[in-house]
């Protein structure tokens, strides 16, 4: 995902480019805004920009191994956690990861409501459950041994 693919949010894109280029990325960022403003797209572009080995003109190159992995949601340092409707046998968002990746590939700028429609959530309330919180902590503790 390139920053140029995101409509608007120019100040946010400039800020993200600046903190990545100057190696001053804070330990956490909260990206928020009204529905339909491209928050997830901005986060995806930032992650790809951080990992890109050949940034060009404020954009990820799109062709290095890291960029190719990001474009298919298979980069080792990228993981998703999202609200879902708990069903029998599905305890973590990882249980929905195939559907999530397909959703993002087919609908790169769609909103949360569209994801709920994909899940066929009905009147069920999607949540991030305790098991999911434990899974986030486990994933964040991964270490590469290279």
Q: Which residues does each PLM region occupy?
A:
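Clamp-loader machinery-focused feature within the broader ASCE/P-loop NTPase space
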Residues: 2-146
